[in-house]
Amino acid sequence: MAGQRLAAGFLQVPAVTRAYTAACVLTTAAVQLELLSPFQLYFNPHLVFRKFQVWRLITTFLFFGPLGFGFFFNMLFVFRYCRMLEEGSFRGRKADFVFMFLFGGVLMTLLGFLGSLFFLGQALMAMLVYVWSRRSPHVRVNFFGLLNFQAPFLPWALMGFSLLLGNSVVTDLLGILVGHIYYFLEDVFPNQPGGKRLLLTPSVLKLLLDDPQEDPDYLPLPEEQPEL
C-alpha cells in the first residue's frame, strides 16, 4: 500500500519534473549497480562528434555523483524547484519549460567545454533555482532551519553551502550565469523600451507538449499560492 501511494503521488508530479528527476535517479542507480560507468556519461566533444556518442550531450546533466549525501541534497533541490517552476510561472506552458531546459543545456555545454566541466547537472540545478528565485522575489526561504532570507539570495546560499562541503563553485556559478541570461532575455529585456522576446519556443514543441486545457484538479504547492 505504501508503495502504491508513493507511486500515485509521483504520478501527480508535473511531467517535466517527473521525467528529469526519474532520469537522474535511474542514471545514478545504474552507476551504483555498475551497469554504467561515469566514464560513459561525461561530456567529451571528441567522443560526441568524432565517435558519435551523442548520448553524452544528455547524460552530462543526469549524473550527480555517487549515491550519498551530495546526491540526495542535489535531488531535493532539483525536484523541489523544478516542480515549483513547472507549477508556477510555467504552469500550462510545458513547451516553454522544455525550451528553457534546451536553451540552458546548450549554453552550459558550450561554456562548460571552455571551462573543462564534464558533468553539468549541478549547473542545471543552479539555473532552475536562480530562475525560480528571481521570479519569486518576495518569498521567504528557510534554509535547513538555519537561515531565513528572501528567495533571490538562495542561489548564493547554495553556492556557499557547496563551498563548505569542499566542492568547486565554478559549476554553481555557471548555472547562475546561464539562469541570469535566461531571466534577462525572457523577463527583463522584453519589458524595456524597444525590447522584445528573443527566446521564442518552436511551434513544434508547443504542438507536441502543451496541454489543450488546464487540469481542473490542479493544486499548487503552498509556496505558489497567493497570500490572503
From Swiss-Prot:
Gene3D superfamilies: Rhomboid-like (1.20.1540.10). GO terms for cellular component: endoplasmic reticulum membrane. It is a multi-pass membrane protein. The keyword Transcription regulation does not apply. It comes from the Eukaryota. Its main location: endoplasmic reticulum. GO terms for molecular function: signal recognition particle binding. Belongs to the derlin family. Forms homo- and heterooligomers with DERL2 and, to a lesser extent, with DERL1. Interacts with VCP and EDEM1. Interacts with SELENOK and SELENOS. Interacts with the signal recognition particle/SRP and the SRP receptor; in the process of endoplasmic reticulum stress-induced pre-emptive quality control. Functional component of endoplasmic reticulum-associated degradation (ERAD) for misfolded lumenal glycoproteins, but not that of misfolded nonglycoproteins. May act by forming a channel that allows the retrotranslocation of misfolded glycoproteins into the cytosol where they are ubiquitinated and degraded by the proteasome. May mediate the interaction between VCP and the misfolded glycoproteins. PANTHER family: DER1-LIKE PROTEIN, DERLIN. This is Derlin-3.
